Amino acid sequence: MSRRCAITGKSAMNGHSVSHANNKTKKKFGVNLRTIRIKLEDGSTTKIKVAASTLRTMKKASK
């Protein structure tokens, strides 16, 4: 399974690590994934991987 958010589709992106001397090396910025359980309409539960930013938005929307 890929490291991708199941709801928004967010995945890792590429960039540079920049040192104090301004040397640049390639770096991969990963997604902060969390495994959560959600209840489906039929009453069963399933596990999905969700980005932490998506989880925060979901919690804000449920208030």
Swiss-Prot record:
Residues 1-22 are annotated as: Disordered. GO terms for biological process: translation. This is Large ribosomal subunit protein bL28. Transmembrane segments: none annotated. One of its GO terms (cellular component) is ribonucleoprotein complex. The lineage of its organism: Bacteria, Pseudomonadati, Campylobacterota, Epsilonproteobacteria, Campylobacterales. Keywords: Ribonucleoprotein, Ribosomal protein. Gene3D superfamilies: Ribosomal protein L28/L24. The keyword ATP-binding does not apply. It comes from the Bacteria. It comes from Campylobacter hominis (strain ATCC BAA-381 / DSM 21671 / CCUG 45161 / LMG 19568 / NCTC 13146 / CH001A). Pfam families: Ribosomal_L28. InterPro entries: Bacterial_rp_bL28 (IPR050096), Ribosomal_bL28 (IPR026569), Ribosomal_bL28/bL31-like_sf (IPR034704), Ribosomal_bL28_bact-type (IPR001383), Ribosomal_bL28_sf (IPR037147). The gene is rpmB.
